[in-house]
């Protein structure tokens, strides 16, 4: 039961950090390349 409580307290924190960093990354990409359908650093 203690392991379940530890999991339930760690999972929301990790998911919040992950989704927050992912949202920040997407915001920064859209700030430098607004409305880009193709990104310059992906074209070879």
Swiss-Prot record:
Keywords on record: Chloroplast, Membrane, Photosynthesis, Photosystem I, Plastid, Thylakoid, Transmembrane, Transmembrane helix
Location within or outside the cell: Plastid, Chloroplast thylakoid membrane
Pfam families given in the database record: PSI_PsaJ (PF01701)
A cellular component term, taken from the record's GO annotations: chloroplast thylakoid membrane
Record has Oxidoreductase as a keyword: no
Membrane topology designation: Single-pass membrane protein
GO biological process: photosynthesis
Gene3D superfamilies: Single helix bin
Bilayer-spanning residue ranges: 7-27
InterPro entries xrefs: PSI_PsaJ, PSI_PsaJ_sf
Keyword Transmembrane helix: yes
Annotated function: May help in the organization of the PsaE and PsaF subunits.
Family, as annotated: Belongs to the PsaJ family.
Stated name of the protein: Photosystem I reaction center subunit IX
Organism: Fagopyrum esculentum subsp. ancestrale
């Amino acid at each position: 039961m203690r392991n379940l409580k530890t999991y339930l307290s760690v999972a929301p924190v990790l998911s919040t950090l992950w989704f927050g960093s992912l949202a920040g990354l997407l915001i920064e990409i859209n700030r430098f390349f607004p409305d880009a359908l193709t990104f310059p650093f992906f074209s070879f």
